[in-house]
Amino acid sequence: MTEGDLAARLAATSFRYPLRRYQQAAVDAFEQARREGRARFYAVLPPGGGKTAVGLEVARRLGRRTLVLCPNTAVQAQWLRQWQDFTPHTVAAGADPDLTTPITVLTYQALCVLNGDDTLDEEALDLWIATLQAEKGYSAEQARAEIQALEASGSPHYRADLARFRRRARTLVARGGDRSDLLALLHPNGRAIIARMAASGPWTLVLDECHHLLEMWGYLVRALVEELGDVFVVGLTATPPSDMDAREAALYRDIFARANIEVPIPALVREGDLAPYQELVYLTTPLPHEADYIAAQHARFQELLLRLMELDFGSVPFPVWLRTRVEERRGRDGAQVSWERFERDEPRLAQAALRLLHSWGAPPPDGARFSERDRQPLTADDWVALIEDYCLRCLRPSADPRDVAAWEEIRRALPSLGYILTRRGVRAHVSPVDRVLTLSASKAAAAVSILDVESAALGDQLRALVLCDYERAGSDLLARLRGVLDPQAGSAALLLHILASDPTTAALHPVLLTGRTVACSRATAVDLTQWIKEQVPELRDQMTTEQLFLPGNDESDTRWEDVVVIRPASTWWQPRRYVPLLTRYFEEGRSRCLVGTRSLLGEGWDARRVNVLVDLTAAATPTAVHQMRGRSLRLDPDLPDKVADNWDVVCVAPGHPKGTADYDRFVRKHHHYFAATVEGEIESGVSHVHPELSPYGPPDPAHFAAINTAMLRRAEERAAAHARWNIGEPYEGRETHTVRVRFGRTPGLSRSRLLTPGARPGAGAVGRFRRRLGQVLAGSAAAGIIVAAAGPDLAGLAAGIVATAGGGAWLVRDLHEVVRQLGPSDALEDIAAAVAEGLRDTGGIAPELGAESVRVVAQADGYYRCYLAGASEADSRRFTEALDEVLAPLASPRYIIPRYIADPPGSMLDTALLALRLRRTGRRGRAVVYHAVPSYLAANRQRADRFARAWNRYVSTGEPIYWKDPQASAIIATQRGADPFDVTTQMRVLWR
């Protein structure tokens, strides 16, 4: 077929379904890029958002031969199926590496597999020698001798280490930029594909799930694009990679430039194109024998901590060193630096020091304050930050024998916590405690409980997907934890066995589906094999089953007798065929629970009926999280009111410094993932799961049962979850930073109480008072005089009330309201209004924003959420950070500003006298506290003065005072660390 014939046939082809609004927007963005002469198109669409249709439509419009690269065979099959929705069927699509069809769909592995020969062994050995020199201080001869001895011994570690340094050598070649050297690393099959493409262009190259292209695959794809020359690159992903280093970001930009369109998940849920969902968690603690092991590990670490606190440990004891570091804070030049600078230069050390001081009940250092993050127990990472600083800055430079001995003692103790001390610092190692938490048997038990409740709630409609990291555990994975964990702990195979053994979950007929195995119970196998014979006649005489036997289980282990593998004796039985087949079996409801690995079913796999996801993986990157969650978000045509329940199972070991490792992963999973809260707000972070969950540490284990009960109850209340999404309602489509405020209960003069929203009278109080005063005075000789005096003049109000003593309780109450409103304010909305106007007047936020944009919303857990309506992401962030600074204790402000506190009047006479004083002095009171002028507004005197005008208007009389002023220095020293309000704040992000 000629190039012209292909273009004509593709032009005559069309997608049989109308494109959704955002799909059409993506195609329009492509056309705009093409009009601009660009040969790149990059779209970010959520899982289930129809990326495949968009990619094929773009390829159709380009009218060229097309190669689609995707991450696995399940996704490959979906591309081929989707092309069948383009009619008429005059252009063939296939999966032949010989590129025999105009549209070819291959996996990245088919193209990018590397040559397995030893061409880089010399470079790998050089890297190995250099590494031994750096880490162990060897000479080149010593390093070479150790490697040769390892090879001669026949140790498997030699082959493993050589393979590792080969990979590193290949990476260096890839980063070197020589295209021919890089392409020479490819397997001959990959080089043959490139040669065929070069001889038959021009091409459209579609890169599906292109977030994978950060390292070797990315370098190879970039080399392919450069080799072909005339190629249009289409990048598609649901999850653009985050946390890229500079090299990865540059590579990604080289391939794709910038995104042409990005559509967030909540937008498609609100539009009704994805299913609403709720994020749920089941919290567990280790089983008794696991807890005993963790306690033993904890004891070792406690011994180290006790030694660190002894005054004869090292020439400079650890507590003395720490006190000196955080109080004197010497920079590299020896000069003392501010806490702000110290925190910026040493963020991990600063956080760890604050947490340690808070745990001791000690005040923060000058210029610091305890935030929500700092009021958490120390984690293992915190201790490591403190210990690393002590080792590198105090012990290592010293030749004192006490310091040498202290270094060795720390070096021997750290591996039990999962760290290794080297000359360059402390680096993470595999932590046995973390592994026990990740693979705890309590998680499988939790999965059974979850599926039990979900089955009761959904009945025959249940379609559950349980994801694990691997199908089966290797023999060495858990070698150090024999007797603590099952040899197959964490594997999909063990989970299948557990589900098949429990009477409740066995009724779901769970099936294990991976890239190499289909397994189930013997009872399920009877139905499954018969069904397969009906669907694939050529397998009718080929069906066989055999017992699933896994490494690490001896012959006496009879648990696996009831678990069998389906393995037809036919070449037809390949993942790209049996995965769609088993998916259909699942969607028909013959099995209501699939167990699989995230590598196959956690990305790209499409099953519309999945409505429960149980995530048992350790993957916590935004990419992995969005991909796995995306499996449950597709609309189900048979269940119009579908709500997906996405479950995490988290194991916490209370008391152990590494005991929050699994919870920390849970926090990372939800860090920038949006979901509906119980309030119906779309929020990122773990608080959208449950308001008691903090990003800085787990709740008290005593609350686990109550939280789990609440989660299981929500699984039964899908209608409420559906309603929280407000499907069909308009949305702004922007992220908004907010601050949540919880009010204390201890008011006082030096520590006043921040008024809850609504506690402060509205603007109509003065007019209401005047009308009622006129009613009381009507008919009296003095009426006209007093009402006239009462006008806007507060003294007239006071005179009026004194003259009409006994005129009514409501009159006294209204006067109290008016006087309080015109006096200094301690109301949240007034302080927020002052911050908003100060930022607006200094150009810190958009000019259309201000006091009228402030919103304060009561929350069910006792917090109030404050934010700026209509603000951009950047403006909302600046506002919430500034408001948080004003509400917080003084740390090291550049400017401070007073807020007066008025005594509440106790009688009618007190009210009158207060009114007279306010008329004379303005918004002052008998006591005063000071607040920090927010950093942005304290950048210079002009900004501080403009903030002061807004502060005077809404909060209190007072002028900003520069920190070097003697008065300010004395105030800061006196008030530092004291909370001007008894409040707790939390910073959160909403999607609106």
Where are each of the predicted segments found?
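Conserved pre-motif I regulatory segment
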Residues: 2-42
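Conserved C-terminal RecA-like helicase domain
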Residues: 46-49, 92, 97, 102-103, ...
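Conserved Walker A/P-loop ATP-binding site and its immediately adjacent core
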Residues: 47, 52-87, 107-113, 217, ...
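Conserved helix-turn-beta segment of the N-terminal RecA-like "Helicase ATP-binding" lobe
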Residues: 74-98, 114-128, 253-256
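Post-DEXD/H (motif II) to motif III coupling segment of the RecA-like Helicase ATP-binding lobe
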Residues: 212-274
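Long, largely alpha-helical accessory region at the distal end of helicase-like NTP-driven motors
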Residues: 305-354, 661-910, 917-924
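A short beta-strand element within the Helicase C-terminal
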Residues: 595, 605-618, 627, 644-648
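Conserved segment of the helicase C-terminal RecA-like domain
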Residues: 627, 631-663
